[in-house]
Every structure is written in C-alpha cells, then in structure tokens.
C-alpha cells in the first residue's frame, strides 16, 4: 500500500505543475502588450507607472524648457498612437494649456516586458517626458513682468526676503548696541545736569564770571557748560588749561573731546533719522510689499489671452 501511495504522489506532482503553467501564462498574457497595438494612453501628474523589471517612474515628468517646470504643471495628458515609422510608435500628446506655454520635446517611455528593446511592453508602464516652452505671448508677458517686478520676480523676491529674515537677528543686535551707546552719550554729554551748581569764585580770588575775555560759542548740540571756563575748575584744572590746550594736547591721541565729538555725530545721525517721515509700505498683490514710489501706480499684471488644447509630437523610448 505504501508503494502504491508513493507512485500516485509521483504522478500527481507533475500534473499539478502542468496545471499552474496556464495560469502563469494567462497572467503574463494579460500584462504583456504589443506596443504597436496601444492606440491611446491617459497619463496623470500624481501617478506612477507600473513596473516589473525596473523602478516605477512618474507618468508625467518635465525635463526642462524655457518656461521651467514649475510655472505650469499639466494635470492630465492624453497621447494617441499616430503610426509606426518602421522602428517605433509615433505619438501625439494633447493637453489644455495656457496660451503662454507649449510643448517642446515629448517622448513616451515604456518598459520592455523581458528586455528594453522587447516589442512587447508591460501594461501600464508608459509615461511621458516633456519640455515646457514659452510661446511668443509668454515671452512678451515675461519681459513685461520683469520690467514691472512681476511674472517670475517672486522667486528672487522670496530669496531676498529669506535673506532679510536671516539677517534680522544680527541687525537687531547691532541696532540695540548703537542705541545704548547713543543713549549713554546723550545722558553723559547732552542732557542737562540734575543739580544746578552755582559758580564759585576761585580759592585764590579769581572769579571766572568776572573775566571779560570772550570765548568761542559752543558747538551745535552741546551745553555751554562744557565750553564754560568753570569746566577747568570742576575738573581740577588751572586757569592756564584752556590757553595751553592747543599746544599741550595737540599731539595726544583721542580722549575726552574725541568722545564728545563722536557723541555729537551719533546724536546728529539719530536725530536726523527720527526726523525723516515714515512712508507706509505699499502692498502690490503681484509683487508684494514695496516702498518704491513707482509701485504706487495702478499696475495690473498682464493677463493671458486664454486656454487652448496644445499638442506635442514625439517617439518612443524603451527602458
């Protein structure tokens, strides 16, 4: 009995293998399509092709062109078989497109079923590679837009805005430091004293108020106290300090008076900055915020003349 069972198992195994062959052949037959028999294919921007020997690829793939790949992205393209040139299928691909754009080079790419040059291809493996070009109308719109700061200048403006964002932190720190320095200079040299001191006669009988020698007017923005002769007394200097300043300090480096000059310049600059009127930014919906007077004109971006069905012609590429 054991020998009979073994004999039947040996006979059944080949039969089971033969029964699976038609199923595999049917599956391959359904997925294996003669390229010349394909009459039309519909391709979508958000889908990938089928794949068997290689990796899937996008059904619609832009590979360049004068218009760039991001200005207009077709969502659905349909390609029709227009004949056989003796080597491969020739295609006409159509899509609804703005009048500013057109197809350049188009090429349908399909995966050979067993090898790249196989006349049979995998069903659903075809995709489209194309270039996107500007029409004459598109070139005119592009030139008009660049003159006015629109139609493509958003890319450069967004880059400059991102650069400004990166530098805002360091600029704010520098501005804060300058404001602190200017405020310190202002409080130290330019603001009035909190306690008004009355002049006193010199211990040796010399009264500064009794002197009749005229002194030069103080520089703009400074208190007269800093040029008054009592300053010598306050800082412990002798009467001859001011008369000998030109000779005794002409060869010395920057000191107290240099600091005063620097404070005056900073005070002038910040005062001039505060005196400038504020100009509110003008927001242009085409190019973004701007302070330029030219942008206050009633500018409207150039409008397209409409949409049409654009066609592109090309052959087949195998992979």
Swiss-Prot record:
Residue spans crossing the bilayer: 172-192
Subcellular location per the Swiss-Prot or TrEMBL entry: Endoplasmic reticulum membrane
UniProt keyword terms in alphabetical order: Calcium, Calcium transport, Endoplasmic reticulum, Ion transport, Membrane, Signal, Transmembrane, Transmembrane helix, Transport
InterPro entries xref list: SARAF (IPR009567)
Skewed-composition ranges (Polar residues): 292-308
GO CC, one annotated term: endoplasmic reticulum-plasma membrane contact site
UniProt topological domain (Cytoplasmic) ranges: 193-319
One Gene Ontology biological process: regulation of store-operated calcium entry
Region feature Disordered, mapped onto this chain: 200-221, 292-319
Membrane topology: Single-pass type I membrane protein
Principal location: endoplasmic reticulum
Stretches assigned to the Lumenal side: 27-171
Segment forming the signal sequence: 1-26
Function: Negative regulator of store-operated Ca(2+) entry (SOCE) involved in protecting cells from Ca(2+) overfilling. In response to cytosolic Ca(2+) elevation after endoplasmic reticulum Ca(2+) refilling, promotes a slow inactivation of STIM (stim1 or stim2)-dependent SOCE activity.
Family the entry assigns: Belongs to the SARAF family.
Protein name: Store-operated calcium entry-associated regulatory factor
Native source species: Xenopus tropicalis
């Amino acid at each position: 009995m054991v020998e009979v069972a073994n004999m039947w198992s040996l006979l059944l195994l080949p039969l089971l293998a033969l029964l699976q062959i038609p199923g595999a052949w049917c599956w391959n037959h359904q997925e294996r399509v003669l390229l010349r028999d394909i009459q039309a294919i519909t391709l979508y921007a958000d889908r990938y092709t089928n794949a068997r020997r290689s990796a899937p690829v996008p059904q619609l793939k832009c590979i360049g062109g004068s218009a760039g790949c991001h200005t207009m992205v077709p969502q659905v393209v349909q390609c029709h078989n227009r004949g056989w040139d003796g080597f491969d299928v020739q295609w006409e691909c159509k899509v609804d497109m703005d009048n500013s754009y057109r197809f350049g080079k188009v090429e349908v790419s399909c995966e050979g079923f067993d090898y790249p040059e196989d006349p049979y291809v995998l069903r659903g493996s075809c995709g489209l590679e194309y270039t996107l070009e500007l029409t004459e109308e598109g070139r005119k719109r592009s030139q008009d837009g660049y003159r006015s700061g629109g139609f493509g200048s958003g890319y450069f403006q967004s880059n400059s805005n991102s650069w400004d964002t990166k530098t805002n932190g360091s600029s704010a720190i520098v501005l804060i430091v300058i404001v602190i320095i200017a405020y310190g200079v202002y409080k130290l040299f330019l603001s009035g004293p909190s306690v008004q001191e009355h002049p006193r006669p010199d211990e040796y009988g010399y009264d500064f108020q009794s002197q009749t020698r005229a002194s030069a007017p103080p520089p703009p923005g400074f208190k007269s106290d800093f040029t008054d002769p009592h300053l010598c007394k306050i800082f412990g200097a002798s009467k001859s300090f001011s008369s000998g300043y030109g000779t005794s300090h002409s060869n010395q480096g920057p000191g107290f008076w240099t600091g005063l000059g620097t404070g005056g310049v900073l005070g002038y600059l910040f005062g001039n900055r505060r005196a400038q009127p504020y100009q509110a930014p003008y927001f242009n919906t085409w190019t973004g915020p701007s302070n330029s007077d030219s942008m206050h004109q009633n500018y409207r971006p150039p409008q397209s003349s409409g949409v049409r069905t654009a066609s592109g012609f090309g052959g087949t590429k195998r992979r």
